[in-house]
Amino acid sequence: MNIVKLQRKFPILTQEDLFSTIEKFRAIDLDDKGWVEKQQALEAVSKDGDATYDEARETLKHVGVDASGRVELDDYVGLVAKLRESKTGAAPQTTFNVAPNSTPIVSTAATGLQHKGKGTQAKIIVAGSQTGTTHTINEEERREFTKHINSVLAGDQDIGDLLPFPTDTFQLFDECRDGLVLSKLINDSVPDTIDTRVLNWPKKGKELNNFQASENANIVINSAKAIGCVVVNVHSEDIIEGREHLILGLIWQIIRRGLLSKIDIKLHPELYRLLEDDETLEQFLRLPPEQILLRWFNYHLKQANWNRRVTNFSKDVSDGENYTILLNQLDPALCSKAPLQTTDLMERAEQVLQNAEKLDCRKYLTPSSLVAGNPKLNLAFVAHLFNTHPGLEPIQEEEKPEIEEFDAEGEREARVFTLWLNSLDVDPPVISLFDDLKDGLILLQAYEKVMPGAVDFKHVNKRPASGAEISRFKALENTNYAVDLGRAKGFSLVGIEGSDIVDGNKLLTLGLVWQLMRRNISITMKTLSSSGRDMSDSQILKWAQDQVTKGGKNSTIRSFKDQALSNAHFLLDVLNGIAPGYVDYDLVTPGNTEEERYANARLAISIARKLGALIWLVPEDINEVRARLIITFIASLMTLNK
């Protein structure tokens, strides 16, 4: 390396500085490759005291590191030089624009990292991917979510040695770049979602390249969507580039999904005690988990003869009074009402959390986030309380509510159709498919999303501003319009009337939604059809069979109802034809037992997601040969392969 050339390029560094920096680079470039990974460079700089990890991380964004993400000697020297500029007061190169009358920033680093506010308002502002854009990271959310990951993944056989991650830096986002931590987090929230054997793992201490990391990111994003996470504008490159606000949002969605998954009357029959006097079980089951949590919270407040109620996870809990009563109800012996006598809100919040600690539930919240009314952290805290200390009397056998069990196929399809409708960004999101479609509004939104311009909203009865339900008569007008639209678009809707949707007829509702989803698939695949028309099931089947042959395999099926599909061999062979080498047949079992068939199906789903396919079904749908859902699996592969 030409020292003179480097000194001209980075005049802020003396010759002595340059020699020292080069030696430090060589100390971490043990194999003399001429480059190191970003993580190594950041750790080296922060260890030397040249900057904090986060300052070095933000500054590196302004150094011309190439697409490989590897830090070469020139880049490393550039990083050190920019950090030196920030300390000597040289004019920083920043991507931040501050309006003349905006709130003053408490501290601004020339690295482009801004700390704004403190205590309850502590936030970090980081540069966006576009010049002039910024994103805000809530420090307490980042810290608590990092603690959660450290806790649930501690001892993991694959990544446990990486933990714990520092809770006071942005290192978490760098650790998430290869998709492995996020995959493990998804499996913690919803076990068995990802077959980790399909993930790309580092070998011989070498980090994954960008392509391998992007495949892992595909699995993460598509799996998160499939378990019901709201994943908007997050792409594989966002993960591998460590974009903080997007990764933090994704982490929250995954944690939230896991925390709320146990708020289910089938798992907790004692939730039946939360029904109000004039409420039916069917109405109660329509509530989203957050509303059930609020109902649970208020049940305990009512049992305590407390005069307040909570309607949110922010201002209604921010003074700590309602939490004091709740914890006292859950365990009067351990959790006293003494915090009510404390007037200072921060002191009271600390006392509340000390009570929670006695229940081994001091998690997610800090005094400052409690007083600030952080809705995410308060929701997580209350969900954790419910999951560990529901405090409801067990239901006796004679009291047990009759929870209607409709046919397994209908339940499976309802789950997939709910996820699909929510992926269209319908508003409000669908919680209970058959109940939420009764007024026709979600159906009509879905028609418009799938076939823009199809719906004349002048003919649609909307809900009043209060959010109250519309009358049965108006709901019938909407659902009749939805059925008429379907017929006009060529759907087979023999015997289906609007009243069937309003009355919650499950079979007929599923039939209508399936045809709408099928049309959505067909529109996406039209470019694949030589005629430009909708593709029939037989054409889709022929395409799948051609892929099997192309991959040198000979499995066959007669239709999408063929029981031979149950062991997933055919689907794995289709994947092999699309992407040779992606199916490791050493991992494929004969499929003689239920466990083997499940393992094969999970393997097929994970490989499809790795390739970038959005797969809604779960392994049981394949094992039980749910024909419609298997068609969606093949159709996703077709759109991927076009």
From Swiss-Prot:
SMART domains: CH (SM00033). Ca(2+) 2 binds at residues 66, 68, 70, 75. Gene3D superfamilies: Calponin-like domain. Residues 16-50, 51-86 form the EF-hand domain. Residues 125-394 are annotated as: Actin-binding 1. Residues 139-259, 287-390, 411-521, 534-642 form the Calponin-homology (CH) domain. It comes from the Eukaryota. One of its GO terms (cellular component) is cytoplasm. Ca(2+) 1 binds at residues 29, 31, 35. Coiled coil: none annotated. InterPro entries: Actinin_actin-bd_CS, CH_dom, CH_dom_sf, EF-hand-dom_pair, Fimbrin/Plastin. GO terms for biological process: actin filament bundle assembly; actin filament network formation; actin filament organization; formin-nucleated actin cable assembly. Residues 395-642 are annotated as: Actin-binding 2. CDD domains: CH_FIMB_rpt1, CH_FIMB_rpt2, CH_FIMB_rpt3, CH_FIMB_rpt4. Binds to actin, and functionally associates with actin structures involved in the development and maintenance of cell polarity. Keywords: Actin-binding, Calcium, Metal-binding, Repeat. Present with 3510 molecules/cell in log phase SD medium. This is Fimbrin. One of its GO terms (molecular function) is actin filament binding. Disulfide bonds: none annotated.
